[in-house]
């Protein structure tokens, strides 16, 4: 459960992420593909090289989805319903991959905003990403 302080930290963080969400999403995907090569199996049709247009486009989707989620903290299931259906029924992504991408997103945000990435902000963003992951995997059952 996100506390009011968590929600404030998330809103502040996304205010600073702002127009960089697509770039950060792509960077996090690249980190994930490099650090956890098994995740590449879900993207056999992608050019996974650095700066790839396909990775950038998917990074934008990730960034847009997280921004939407941050704007709907009190109703993540509704905000992410279509995405949850897609990942559960069509793409069939192993739920562990959401944790891997979440880790890479945290590293990316910390790298770009080291002064703002306090332990409290880290904890709030981690809880937020865990909640997003839970919603995205809720329709697997």
Curated annotation (Swiss-Prot):
One GO BP annotation here? hydrogen peroxide catabolic process
Q: What do we know about how this protein assembles, alone or with others?
A: Heterotetramer of two alpha chains and two beta chains.
Report the SUPFAM superfamilies cross-referenced here. Globin-like
* Family, similarity comment: Belongs to the globin family.
- PROSITE patterns reported in the protein's UniProt record: GLOBIN
- Residues with PTM N6-acetyllysine: 16
Q: Spell out the molecular function terms from Gene Ontology.
A: haptoglobin binding; heme binding; iron ion binding; organic acid binding; oxygen binding; oxygen carrier activity; peroxidase activity
Positions bearing N6-succinyllysine = 7, 11, 16, 40
Where does the record place the Globin domain? Answer: 1-141
What organism is the protein native to? Vicugna pacos
Q: Which Pfam families match?
A: Globin (PF00042)
Give a yes or no for keyword Cell cycle in this entry: no
**Record-linked InterPro entries:** Globin, Globin-like_sf, Globin/Proto, Hemoglobin_a-typ, Hemoglobin_oxygen_transport, Hemoglobin_pi
- Specify whether Transport is a keyword of the entry: yes
Q: In which tissues is it expressed?
A: Red blood cells.
User: What is the protein named?
Assistant: Hemoglobin subunit alpha
In this chain, O2 is annotated as bound at 58
């Amino acid at each position: 459960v996100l506390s009011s302080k968590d929600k404030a930290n998330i809103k502040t963080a996304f205010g600073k992420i702002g127009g960089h969400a697509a770039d950060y999403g792509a960077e996090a995907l690249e980190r994930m593909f490099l650090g956890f090569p098994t995740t590449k199996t879900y993207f056999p049709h992608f050019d996974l090289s650095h700066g790839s247009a396909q990775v950038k486009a998917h990074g934008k989707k990730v960034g847009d989805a997280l921004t939407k989620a941050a704007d709907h903290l009190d109703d993540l299931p509704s905000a992410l319903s279509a995405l949850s259906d897609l990942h559960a029924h069509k793409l069939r992504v192993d739920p562990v991959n959401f944790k891997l991408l979440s880790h890479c997103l945290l590293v990316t945000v910390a790298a770009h905003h080291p002064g703002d990435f306090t332990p409290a902000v880290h904890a709030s963003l981690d809880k937020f990403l865990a909640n997003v992951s839970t919603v995205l995997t809720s329709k697997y059952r």
